[in-house]
Amino acid sequence: MPKVEIYKSILLEKIGKILTKSELVSVLEMAKAEICEFDTVNDKIKIEFNDTNRPDLWSCAGLARQIKTYLFGHLPLFKFFSMADNLQEFYGEILVSPEVFSIRPFIFGFLAKGVICNERMLETLIQLQEKLCHNYGQKRKRVAMGMYSSDLIEFPLSYTACNSDYRFIPLGMDREMSIEEINRVHSKGIEYSTILASFNKYPLLLDDKDKVLSYPPVINSHDIGALKVGDTDLFIEVTGTNLEATLLSLSVTACDLHDMGFEILPVKTIFPNETLFGKEIICPYYFQNMLEVNVDNVNKMLGSNFTANNMCLDLKKLGISAYFKELDKFYVIPPVYRNDFLHEVDVIEEIMIGMGLDSFKPELPKDFTLGRLSQIEEFSRKIKNLMIGMGFQEMIYNYLGSRTDFIEKMNIEGDDFLSVANPMTEGYEYIRGSIVSDLLKSESISSNFPYPHKIFEIGKVALKDLNSVDGTITYDNLAFLMADKEFSFNEINSLVSSLFYYLNIEFKLRESSKSLYIDGRGVDILINDTVLGGFGEVSPYILRNFGIMVPCCVLEINLNKLLN
């Protein structure tokens, strides 16, 4: 979970109220945060956040804004945001080339002027940059940020792609280096260039005089890419692979700098292709959607009997605008610096926090029940023990993933896969319909470990089902993978036979037509003419998609059907 260090005196100054240690501990619960350490000598507090969905809190300015709003009920106002129907005046342009749009497509920026940067302010900004890029930005893969002195920059900027022999002086060095050399020698290149490993060109940000600002998301330039004490005019840019995550990171930073006293001046980005919010976007940009919330649903979930007006007032404590036109529903307008409202239940959680957790009286359960393992759980545990006994290592994966991993790399249509309507990131846009893709992904990053590799998982998969009430059906599946140059169909066939022998279940095999397998080396498993799954040698085409160089055999069977 994210941890930040902030200056206590600055925090209390921005809140506008002196808080004792116990009062501060109490009010931090509202932000799902707790104090890890008090450093009275250096005037610092180390705070850990128990929620990764609120990057707006990972700074002194953001946390102070939330506490101040909670204590005094004043909604923060940021007038420099553009909206689809209300565009602000812009003070610079970023031109995106078609070449870079297929590599790392999104870049946005703004100018911040009017405050002299001191040492503590720079420390705060650098910490915010690191937390946004590392935690929210998935170690710069999804989002990366650059900060510069705008006095050294000539607009418009050009965001383009270059070859590996392009040379400039990177930050922390005193000589020119090629992109290839930076990737190989520079500490940041070694750490972050793998993000771009699948491309033969690299992102580059230049100003109108062809001076290099940065090689995103790896390293800034030596000449322009470092802030220093005494700078007054700043340029902030954020690049990324996810449009909304990139916009939100920029919005969070803009709000923080505004709260520090800076004047925020928007910058326009011009893309070669249309995006979800248009071909030209003036940033900071407000893109969040309004939510409709049913009053009865809130009261049912919280066990309360509040009116829409009560709920709107509780949301206001957390900086969330809400209004009602009807008695049975109200509308929520997310703050410009938040994008974590995916469903009505997220609003209900905020209402509960706004009411105060101590306002809910605990109640003992009224019904007495006996718990026991379900049949499928008992069956799964039996199979798990058998797999471990046969030398396999258990894996546990997320149920959500990307279309690339679940569908495209597996060379399937994916028509029966379930997609998330409003995913936070492209890495969590689909619910898995098979475990095999997860096993192959693990194998793709395990080539440095001694062979053979034998891994398995027993977990849930979900698919579309038009005959069910909600249009979906969930199964418990077993899948395993064997990887070694010596493994072939004979080895996996022997293991499958052993597994069914210990389960005391008879089965039949027939040749499979799935593209997952090499032709003639994959079979379906049948019991009473019902297909329960299959196994075989994985197609070299699919292995190449995952970057796997060693032959693999896989099995996947439906345990619910097997149990029945």
UniProtKB/Swiss-Prot annotation:
Name of the protein this chain belongs to: Phenylalanine--tRNA ligase beta subunit
SMART domains linked to this entry: B3_4, B5
Catalysed transformations (reactions): tRNA(Phe) + L-phenylalanine + ATP = L-phenylalanyl-tRNA(Phe) + AMP + diphosphate + H(+)
SUPFAM superfamilies to which the protein is assigned, alphabetical: Class II aaRS and biotin synthetases, Putative DNA-binding domain
Record-level Gene Ontology MF annotations: ATP binding; magnesium ion binding; phenylalanine-tRNA ligase activity; RNA binding
Main location as per UniProt: cytoplasm
E.C. numbers: 6.1.1.20
Keywords: Aminoacyl-tRNA synthetase, ATP-binding, Cytoplasm, Ligase, Magnesium, Metal-binding, Nucleotide-binding, Protein biosynthesis
Cofactor requirements of the protein: Mg(2+)
Sites where the protein binds Mg(2+): D340, D346, E349, E350
Locations listed in the record: Cytoplasm
Gene this protein is translated from: pheT
